[in-house]
Amino acid sequence: MKVKNSLRSLKNRHRDCRVVRRKGRVYVINKTQRRFKARQG
């Protein structure tokens, strides 16, 4: 999982990327290509 300051570029890496909030943190998840996971921080 990548940790980035801004998720704007990461959510555009694949068409299935979704931005979700969990426990106060912002994540990018991808159900089909799991290597595109990222967390903001």
From Swiss-Prot:
One of its GO terms (biological process) is translation. GO terms for cellular component: ribonucleoprotein complex; ribosome. It comes from the Bacteria. The keyword Hydrolase does not apply. It holds the Pfam family Ribosomal_L36. GO terms for molecular function: structural constituent of ribosome. PROSITE patterns: RIBOSOMAL_L36 (PS00828). Keywords: Ribonucleoprotein, Ribosomal protein. Belongs to the bacterial ribosomal protein bL36 family. This is Large ribosomal subunit protein bL36. It comes from Jannaschia sp. (strain CCS1).
